[in-house]
Amino acid sequence: MVLTKAELIGALQHETNILLHLAGKIDRTQLDYRPTASQRSTMELLRYLSLMGPQLTSACVHGAFDMAAWGAADGAAKARDFDGTLAEIATHSATYAALLADVSDDDLRATITLFGSSGTRGARLVSMVLSGCAAYRTQLFCYLKSCGRDELNTMNLWAGMDTPASA
């Protein structure tokens, strides 16, 4: 794998930090915002993000998707309010580290099949989990921009921080 396990965990933890930074920019009066009728609302997107990464990481680690675990996590996510959802997302950094703690380099190179597609465990972690986190937080960023947060920029999206003030 091109990334070390520590780098993968660090990248997933960085995604968590970026997501929490962006979520902190949400105007609570706009939690029901959705770009079109068929898309998730801001709150629905956050709830999905509160379970997607850890659940797919677990699937990759175990080499099998657990629909019952996903359903339970989805039910719990749907019951959370905004603050509870952010609190759950805040646990992801530790969750990723715990889920990947006992995964060896050999485990990362092992082939698994998920959702009808085979690849190495490491590649699936990158393509499904890490890429998914980046994609969905970018969707949240676009929602924020659509809701008038014009001051948000590349620093917010990729570094998870506001642009530093000029000296």
Model-derived features with residue positions:
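Extreme N-terminal tail/first-helix region
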Residues: 1-11
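Flexible, glycine- and charge-enriched loops at secondary-structure boundaries
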Residues: 5, 82, 126
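Short, contiguous alpha-helical
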Residues: 9-24, 30-73, 113-167
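Secondary-structure boundary/capping positions in well-ordered alpha/beta enzyme cores
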Residues: 29-30, 106
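Helix-adjacent hinge/juxtasegments
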Residues: 58-103
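Acidic catalytic patch
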Residues: 101-116
